[in-house]
């Protein structure tokens, strides 16, 4: 498991050994302790009571993390799960963690699911979520208004295990810019924002729900430029991959924006591993939708989550437990 921060809401081992109650604090768990806890608590049962539930998220300033934290709280509150969130590099790493049973559920963008390194046979979808918007950001002083202006510039394209890096590299490849004249760095959302602020990079890619917290913060400090994705590049990406949608970043998303910005969006999905029991998966989905307003309160991007869209635009087999829930709700027919 990645040596990132693993947040657990209770002191797991102590309380399970002694039956005590404990203060509700976030606690970092080392790899050996996490492995021990999982071996003791993740046997599948009829519900989530006292089950260890790790959620793969992303950068601590991103939407995945905000929603993961809220989901964790919901599963503890309504299902009695012992739940926590894992800070990761996001989509690509999350699919790896879930497929290896190092996390029970994880957030990912659908374009990651068809990568050669993604073993779809080990993964199952629980529900479609909201969409990520590709946001290519610079500061006004850099005079970068188009993709062509990125030649010779310092650009952050996201961390190695992120969907941001995947789509950034695909866009740059389709732009036909000379790769030897692009100075790329691989920074998280928070690192990219800080580097834009202090001038150590000239532009950064962010693929996230809107508004992105880091972009919103720096837009209050300096005037930003949002670089549009040309229509011909969008068309080629749609034709080649089939998972990208033409969209626009509304002009009221961030301070200082004067017009909508043409871009692409990518659907997000919540995934689990194939071996999760049907009742367990059913309860995960049921709790999410029965208490959806609580999740939507965690970040504005979650306002786009809708049960009527829960099974759309997901190139992955759904878990039978999720299918059972959506069938009960009349979203899909009997399967």
Describe the function of each predicted region.
Residues 109-113, 119-120, 142-143, 179-271, ...:
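Pocket-lining segment of extracytoplasmic ligand-binding domains
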Residues 50-78, 83, 133-198, 312, ...:
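Bilobed "Venus flytrap"/periplasmic-binding protein-like clamshell domains
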Residues 160-175, 243-317:
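Ligand-binding clefts/hinges and TM-proximal coupling segments of bilobed small-molecule sensing domains
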Residues 25-55, 117-119, 143-154, 320, ...:
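Immediate post-signal peptide segment of exported/extracytoplasmic ligand-binding proteins
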Residues 18-19:
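C-terminal motif of bacterial Sec signal peptides marking the signal peptidase cleavage site
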Residues 50-53, 187, 191, 198, ...:
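An extracytoplasmic/periplasmic, membrane-proximal ligand-sensing/linker region
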Residues 103-106, 122-128:
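Short beta-strand-centered segments that line the small-molecule binding cleft or hinge
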Residues 37-107, 115:
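N-terminal (or domain-start) structured segment
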